[in-house]
Regions:
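Mobile, glycine- and charge-enriched loop segments
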Residues: 124, 259-265, 273-302
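His/Asp/Glu-rich metal-coordinating catalytic cores
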Residues: 2-185, 189-193, 199-215
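Active-site flanking residues adjacent to catalytic metal/cofactor-binding acidic residues
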Residues: 105, 133, 242, 266-267
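Residues that form or flank phosphate/diphosphate-binding pockets in enzymes
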Residues: 86-89, 174, 249-250, 275-276, ...
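Hard-cation-handling environments
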Residues: 140-265, 283, 289-291, 308, ...
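Short, small-residue-enriched loops and turns at beta-alpha junctions
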Residues: 110, 138-141, 271-276, 302-303
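Internal alpha/beta domain cores that form substrate/cofactor-binding pockets in large enzymes
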Residues: 272-275, 295-324
């Protein structure tokens, strides 16, 4: 995107992007030997970080408060917070030339944050000429159980195994809350590995802990290479949350543990290890699953179910619908 084209994002989303690219820059500084190529890579990293800092941002408004709109030319855009598997997602009311367009982006009603979906639509999505809604599950048929049910199922299997690895996304605040709640019910120590996981949890805790009454407060303990906590973890058991790029560390950490006592909870889209195209692009998820003899899939989609999409259309009653 050309630098003179303004870009807009929520503050939470901007913070996550800055965390990601700052970590990439640190990795490039540490992993690459000094060379002309390294200099170019680091310059590119700095340019990306600078560009993200220049994004136009908005703060999420308090519940029952109309969000502030912004203008791009003669187009008025109003962002409305919604639940999705990536933190700080929004729907948009777009008003121009006497027309009102509601663009949902990705959304769902079965997460902890999904309870605001229908009240928001009832209150603000009136007289809509065009509804543009996601339709991911229409072609994929994803399972859409409640996020609270994900947590309940996790707690059950966590109680049956001494050592539990949870493969999950660092940017899914609701899934991390499910893992936390499940581990507490199973009376397991909570740990994480990975720089992005740690930074994301700090962002979530800072921004959301108070308003969520502690649901989104994350105080997992970090564990890394040659960590003195490893001995205690092997003795008492643990729940470790990690991303797919940390398989080597997790395998090393599990060396010497009885394989019958180790469980992998795969908590991500199953297409990452089933779809040949996805595997070709990134085999990390498949490789992670295949490294463990005991694996259980406990996941729910980050996208709206068919029933949810229908209800959204019924509430909005648009003149036209485009499903993407």
């Amino acid at each position: 995107i050309p630098c003179d084209v303004p870009q807009y994002i929520g503050v939470g989303g901007q913070e996550l992007m800055l965390a990601k690219y700052d970590l990439l820059k640190i990795a490039h500084e540490q992993e690459w030997k000094d060379s002309e190529e390294k200099s170019k890579i680091l310059i590119d990293d700095e340019q990306k970080i600078s560009k993200i800092k220049d994004f136009h941002v908005w703060e999420r408004t308090a519940p029952h408060t109309r969000p502030k709109s912004f203008m791009i030319g003669d187009i008025r855009i109003t962002p409305f917070f919604n639940s999705h598997s990536i933190y700080d997602s929004y729907m948009f009311l777009i008003e121009t030339d006497g027309k009102r367009i509601w663009h949902t982006g990705d959304y769902r009603d079965h997460g902890y944050l999904g309870k605001g979906l229908y009240p928001t639509l009832h209150r603000y999505a009136s007289n809509i000429d065009l509804l543009i809604t996601e339709g991911t599950t229409l072609k994929r048929g994803d399972l859409c159980i409640q996020e609270s049910e994900v947590s309940r199922r996790m707690a059950c299997v966590m109680s049956a195994f001494k050592y539990v690895i949870v493969l999950a996304s660092a940017t899914d605040i609701e899934r991390l809350a499910s893992v936390k709640t499940a581990a507490l019910k199973a009376r397991k120590g909570l740990y994480y590995t990975g720089g992005m996981m740690g930074r994301a949890m700090r962002i979530f805790t800072h921004r959301e802990a108070k308003s969520s009454k502690g649901l989104f407060a994350f105080h997992f303990k970090y564990v890394g290479e040659d960590d003195p906590k490893l001995g205690e973890m092997q003795k008492k058991g643990f729940v470790l949350v990690t991303g797919a790029s940390h398989l080597d560390f997790v395998k090393k950490m599990c060396q010497g543990l009885s394989s019958s006592e180790v469980l992998l909870i795969y908590s991500a889209w199953d297409g990452y290890y089933k779809d040949p195209l996805q595997i070709k692009q990134n085999p990390a998820y498949r490789d992670f699953r295949e490294a463990f003899p005991n694996v259980v899939d406990i996941h729910t989609s980050g996208h709206a179910s068919r029933e949810c999409i229908k209800k959204v259309i019924d509430i909005v009653k648009p003149k036209e619908v485009i499903c993407i």
